[in-house]
Swiss-Prot record:
Organism: Vesicomyosocius okutanii subsp. Calyptogena okutanii (strain HA)
Identification of the protein by name: Small ribosomal subunit protein bS16
Organism domain of life: Bacteria
Signal sequence segment: none
Organism classification: Bacteria, Pseudomonadati, Pseudomonadota, Gammaproteobacteria, Candidatus Pseudothioglobaceae
Transmembrane segments: none
GO cellular component: cytoplasm; small ribosomal subunit
Gene field: rpsP
Keyword RNA-binding assigned: no
């Protein structure tokens, strides 16, 4: 079965994730079928946090690929950027 999930890259304490279509039996960071985008949780300045190729994502889901829970959240955020801004506001209010 094909799964759409995150594959970790980057350096120690500086994570960077690729959104990939891969066989569910493979290890998290092993070879994948296709890279569909990326997610950088630690952005600075003008760096782009999230990129997803929606056409390819739709293609793989039409072929029966299962999407992981975290990637579902990221797709929602990608389609509606206000979700991310709201989450940041809530987290900063809790830290006060």
């Amino acid at each position: 079965m094909v799964k759409i999930r995150l594959a970790r890259g980057g350096a120690k304490k500086k994570p960077f994730y690729s959104i990939v279509a891969t066989d569910s039996r493979r290890r998290r960071d092993s070879a994948y079928i296709e890279r569909l985008g990326y997610f950088n949780p630690v952005t600075h300045g003008q760096e782009v946090r999230l990129i997803i190729e929606e056409a390819r994502l739709a293609y793989w889901t039409s072929k029966g690929a299962q999407i992981s829970d975290r990637v579902k959240q990221l797709v929602k955020e990608f389609k509606d950027p206000l979700i991310r801004e709201r989450d940041i506001a809530v987290k900063s209010a809790k830290n006060l």
